[in-house]
Amino acid sequence: MEKLGFHKVSNSPSSPSQPKITHNRPIPHPQSPPLPQRPLSEPLKKQLLVDNSPGNDVVIANCVAVNAQDFQNIPDRAPVILDGVFVYSIAKDDRVRPGTIGLAGNMRTWGKWSLGQPVNVENYNIFHNGQQQQYLGAIDLSIDFRAKARANSNPINHDELVALFLKNYENQILQPTQVIYMEYTGIYFQIRVNNVQIIDVNTKDQLPSFKDSDDINTKGILIKSTDVGFYPYEGSIINLTKPKTLKQRMFGGSTPHRTSRRKQIINPDFKLEDLGIGGLDAEFQDIFRRAFNSRILPPELAEKLDYKHCKGLLLYGPPGTGKTLIARKLSKMLNGKEPKIVNGPEMLSKYVGASEENIRNLFKDAEAEYKLKGEDSDLHVIIFDELDSVFKQRGSGKSDGTGVGDNVVNQLLSKMDGVDQLNNILVIGMTNRLDLIDTALLRPGRFEIQIEISLPDEKGRKDIFLIHTKKLTENGILSSDVNFDELSTLTKNFTGAEIEGLCNSAKSYAISRHTKKGALAQIDPESIAKMKITRDDFLLALNDIRPAFGTDEEDLSQQAQHGIIQFNQTIRNIFEKGQSIIDVVRSSETEHLRSILLYGPPGVGKTSIATTLALNSDFPFIKMLSAETLVGMGELRKIQEIDNVFRDVHKSPLNVLVIDKIENIINYNPIGPRFSNDILQVLMVYLTKKPPKGRRLLIIGTTSQYQVFKHMNLIDSFNDAIAVPPIKHIEEVGKVLDKLGFMNKSEREEILSQLSRYDINIGIKSLIDVLMVSKYSRDTVDEVVNNIVEKMSG
């Protein structure tokens, strides 16, 4: 048997990651434990030289060995304090030379003493000044094999360890960070005191209170009623059985609080502002409340609440909103195992069964630790990016026919919520398409928490600007004229990634101002030292970065190149009614979806009115769906594109969708007649589908086939149907000519005079087309009139 005092012992003060195991031992009244002997002796103060402990019997007794000649007036097993900090009981032993003190390796490591080093020794009275707060109500201990070669995972009876510990060290004074060697069944174990709970019986109502401490200066006497809890060192394979019953330490009618010894799930040094993510305060509150609150509870309380830990967290939303960034930051915040980060397609393999094996391998470490340590195991985080690429709806027929996609979904389901459930995992998934994921994965027990990471609002955009310009501000490079309130207003529907790109573009403009004239790749060193990034740099950058979910004003404005000519009261009424509907969508507490159908013959300006209303709404997201965007697509592909468009217009707080020439979108042909019923049904469903909570949508449709749509019941899907009339009066033609400044006044009057002989019926778009062609052809008045008449008759 090795002699423990003669070997260097590595002190492992790292805190275990596992919760404590409490001992089921009743606690009597605090005044009942017997007091240890208080020897009445002369004050002792000696300086002795450190030597090895004389034998293992002294080591496992947790005593320091001294020669009787040096302690003639001090009884055996009396407590002494070394260097004013470390308290031990003495064991008089003739094997120790006078003037020396025998310290085992674990003692020398704890006190940082070397052999031959002098140490100050004084007798110690824990009850000085009449204090009665020196009994241990509870003690938490880490345990591991002393010799790694003897380590094994055979079950070790926890209750027997507790009984042996109390028998060996009763009435000894113990303190946090102390390391003790104890022998059990012929094997030596290393035990570390992590936390003690001191009983205070000096309260006014004579009921005890309990004070937890992990401070080395906190000392207490181990008594028979002390609650002893063992748990493994971090990384140890020791296998402790659980106590037969959980201890209900009732003391005077109250239950003392015991701090759980499980490693804190949240890194104690973490601060929320360290995440570096702006505009997601509400989302983070939801994540912490639903995913992590249960894991920071003491295990005993969680068991009483029968709280099931969250195993899956799904982040979904448009690209660039920070889903992947959030997952990375959360994994750094968590104080568990190193997270496993995988992309969905990486799980797939061309070999039979390999895809399913890849899924199993992700959970292998968590399974092994959970089998060994149960609820005491660390949290294992698995991060899936592009979840929709692998875990599609089963039976959808979108796989290669091998059924691999279905099997991968089944494998993930069994690992997250199967027969052998794991309680030490958290799977974080990310996707742009929540609708593609198998619905079984979204039920409780799987990805039960689904957080939408949407486009940031104005406050969120300002936060993101502040994050990406923090170093510029700290280093004095950001000009004082930069107004983030202004920039956050100008960047409607920008994602976090797009705002970052905007900041980088502004920096590039600032750098370009400090390049040498005539040289693109040479920096002026004198000028660059004074560089400032100004407001103008950000405004220029706005021309470079366009939001994916923004308004394409150039394309929309081209639909009304000559502006809107309100040639009669009906047109003015259309704009007034349209504006009132816009105000309803913007401000109403109940009407979050409104739809308008503008109908009339071809060429009356329906598209121009629709796009102008959309642009005048000043909504942050305006989208146009027309037959032009669907050219070359088959019917199924068109349906998918329409589905994508409607999903996009649900992502911003305020949205406008212009559906132009609906008859062309549904492939309507009057010969037959023919149309796509599938596309029609999709449109009818989406026209009445309410947007998600917190989102508002205005739909403006146009058609030249009102009667046809009435028979198809499509008109009923719109809230309002507004007729757009053609020009029918000669005065209206005159207003158009005047607005366009066509020819001179006398020529305009001549045109009107000649047209007065005809019945006027022409769309304003058709009229403007004729006038523009005539203008650049330098037609005469008679030719202009003939062109207009031909257009009306054609």
From Swiss-Prot:
Residues 27-37 have a biased composition (Pro residues). GO terms for molecular function: ATP binding; ATP hydrolysis activity; phosphatidic acid binding; SNARE binding. ATP binds at residues 317-324, 600-607. One of its GO terms (cellular component) is Golgi stack. Pfam families: AAA, AAA_lid_3, CDC48_2, CDC48_N. Keywords: ATP-binding, Cytoplasm, ER-Golgi transport, Nucleotide-binding, Protein transport, Repeat, Transport. It is found in: Cytoplasm. One of its GO terms (biological process) is vesicle fusion with Golgi apparatus. Residues 1-40 are annotated as: Disordered. PROSITE patterns: AAA. This is Vesicular-fusion protein SEC18. The lineage of its organism: Eukaryota, Fungi, Dikarya, Ascomycota, Saccharomycotina.
